[in-house]
From Swiss-Prot:
One BP term from GO: mismatch repair
Compartment list: Cytoplasm
Name of encoding gene: rnhB
Gene Ontology molecular-function annotations: manganese ion binding; RNA binding; RNA-DNA hybrid ribonuclease activity
Swiss-Prot/TrEMBL cofactor(s): Mn(2+); Mg(2+)
Native organism: Burkholderia orbicola (strain MC0-3)
Reactions it catalyzes: Endonucleolytic cleavage to 5'-phosphomonoester
Protein family membership: Belongs to the RNase HII family.
EC number: 3.1.26.4
A Pfam family reported for this protein in Swiss-Prot or TrEMBL: RNase_HII
Xref: Gene3D superfamilies: Ribonuclease H-like superfamily/Ribonuclease H
Protein known as: Ribonuclease HII
Keyword Iron: no
GO cellular component: cytoplasm; ribonuclease H2 complex
Amino acid sequence: MTAVRAPRRRASGDVQGGFDFSRPDEIVCGVDEAGRGPLAGPVVAAAVILDPAQPIDGLDDSKVLSAKKRDALYDLIVTRSHAYCVASASVDEIDTLNILHATMLAMKRAVEGLSVLPTLAQIDGNRCPTLSVRAEAIVSGDALVPSISAASILAKVTRDRMLVDLHERFPVYGFNVHAGYGTAKHLAALREHGPCEAHRRSFAPVRAALDLIR
């Protein structure tokens, strides 16, 4: 599937929230993920259909927002959206399928878990999961399409909270600080303690740490 390179501006005109008023039968959801790159924890995806009657100011790519701003927007999104769903693929699924296919699986679960069936799913990035509804990939969609921005925020906040919970179980790795990414301190902890069950053994730094303790 060819990815859509959207113009560097927010959608406007007849498209508001998840509804295209030039086509009353069109219901659009935005989809994004968080956690493809980390060495530990699940990959999380979210799908959001915004409600044009309850606009949300400040939506943007979750990566450019502060944690405080993301948390505030998270509360608004789950309260004001027409529908939303957050789903994940586990570490075992990542290691079995690979991270790309696990990400597609999490996205598929998020779209299929919506309480309202969309007619179009707009996916951040350059490829789409196999869905029962039409889908289009939008490069940099998390910075361009409000519903994708909302999905990126839900996915990021949810995953960060999951990693805080993992920190309670495995405090030596500092998951609450780096969310599983391969920081210098995380890599040092991997070398010292070896991987835990939350680490992705299909990722090279984790395999290298395993080799050290064999």
